Amino acid sequence: MSVTLSSEEMHAKTSVMASKDFLTDRIWLNGVEESASTGRLASCLQSVREAARAAGSEARVETDWRVHICSENNFPTAAGLASSAAGYACLVSALCKLYGIKSDVSALARRGSGSACRSVYGGFVRWFMGNREDGGDSVAAQLQPASHWPGLRVIICVASDHRKTTSSSLGMRNSVNTSELLKYRAEYSVPARSNISLSLYVS
């Protein structure tokens, strides 16, 4: 269960452009170029292109054209404020518009960042684990719009805007491999509490 914060206060903005003249995929984050050839971004781009080919989209750009991506956010990056979730949700939404993909973008956003599948929607959202081995049904769904609780406010105090020394992805992998408590939480605590929260949000 999660709550998507208002994009008026904290947001990511992303523009994408594809061209047959581009030699490689490139990305600029807050004005600084970063690698687009490895890691989650490369995997995300590949997944979106494969989805576009499978859907037979009628976009005016070819899936083998390279893309240039410009993204910026107005809050600290990699500092524990879900910048990856916001960034990948925004990026995949833009890519789906570029390639004419009309299907749910939640599963594609998850390829970049797990939490991004939730950030695609506003309001109150639940991320469903799914059963497929390829994770294709591990998607999010909106339970209630933001208007369900108009008086809700979130106070965020940034103690440090420096990048974390350990990324969220690596930290979670380490926790999965070393923590018995995390396994208990995933098997027992999360399902029970999610069902309680679900009954409250949809009532």
Residue ranges and their predicted role:
Residues M1-A79, S93-K102, G135, A159:
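ATP-binding N-lobe of GHMP and related small-molecule kinases
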Residues E9, A36-G39, A86, D104, ...:
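Conserved active-site and cofactor/substrate-binding residues in soluble primary-metabolism enzymes
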Residues S43-E50, A107, R111, N174, ...:
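Charged/polar, solvent-exposed surface patches and flexible loops
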Residues S43-S47, R118-M129, Y188-N195:
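Charged/polar, low-hydrophobicity segments characteristic of intrinsically disordered regions
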Residues R53-E58, A107-R111, H162, N195-V202:
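Noncatalytic linker/hinge segments flanking ATPase motor cores
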Residues E58-I155:
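Gly/Ser-rich oxyanion-binding loop with an adjacent helix/lid
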Residues A146-S203:
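C-terminal nucleotide
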